[in-house]
Amino acid sequence: MAKVKVAILGSGNIGTDLMIKLERSSHLELTAMIGIDPESDGLKKAKTKGYYVFDGGLKQFLSEASELADLVFDATSAKAHVRHAKALREAGKMVIDLTPAAVGPYVVPSVNLGDYLEESNLNLITCGGQATIPIVHAINRVAQVHYSEIVATIASKSAGPGTRANIDEFTQTTAHGLEAIGGAKKGKAIIILNPAEPPIIMRNAVYALVECEQMDEVAIARSVQETVAYIQSYVPGYRLRTEPLFEGNKVTVFVEVEGAGDYLPTYSGNLDIMTATAIKVAEEWVQHRVKAASV
């Protein structure tokens, strides 16, 4: 099967890590990196590796070499993606959105990936969303979650300008994802940037208040374990810190994410889960497209 050509929009930490990961993909061929800072490490590395490099932003890419990619990963910011989405849609490009812009439908691979493969813009919510929404969904499969609250703690060093610019969108988009995808009737999200040295890996606390009459500790624990195993198939550093904890109708789950160390330090699990998920979604989209074409 021929690989699908892709481009990365955004030459920061996430875009550069994505570039390294794409080298291992059997379905995706990176052709170009697009940025606005010619001195960025991402654009410099991309040029060294022989990829096409555009430092005039998306406008330059679309006007000069749009044919280089059928799919574009947007690793910029939520505000920028709103503009990018329109231009990429008009250019007929498939888009995987790694910002909290939520222009397209929310996608969490373990929950609803197959539902939106005909869409042209898929949103990956946030790092906290990818780490915690599957857990809420796993609990909700067994017992209705009336309220869910998640606290995502990440190393301050792993939060670059893009992450810091997206804090408000992070909390809003993640909270909505807990409800729309996780199934909670009400969701709340909190993000903490921890300045500790040495930097900590990403840690997430998931709290869920469930329907008392539906509480089944064994079934909930099994459902959570199944979800964790699925996520580990594409994010190996994702794991439970402890077994799920139960108190009355409250379920508490602690998960952590250690990065693969491709471009980013291993403590940057919050960024790693986004890049790994982006590739998972893109590869599933490619396989879906191939199957559809063969029918």
Curated annotation (Swiss-Prot):
Active site at: 127 (acyl-thioester intermediate)
Give me the residues that bind NAD(+), please.
Answer: 11-14, 158-166, 270
Q: What is its EC number?
A: 1.2.1.10
Report the superkingdom from the record: Bacteria
Recorded hits in InterPro entries, A to Z, give: Acetaldehyde_dehydrogenase, Acetylaldehyde_DH_C, NAD(P)-bd_dom_sf, Semialdehyde_DH_NAD-bd
Catalyzed reactions per annotation: acetaldehyde + NAD(+) + CoA = acetyl-CoA + NADH + H(+)
A single GO BP annotation from the record? Answer: catabolic process
GO MF term (any one): NAD binding
The UniProt keywords, alphabetically, are:
Aromatic hydrocarbons catabolism, NAD, Oxidoreductase
Instruction: Return the similarity comment.
Output: Belongs to the acetaldehyde dehydrogenase family.
Q: What is this protein called?
A: Acetaldehyde dehydrogenase
Q: Which gene encodes it?
A: nbaJ
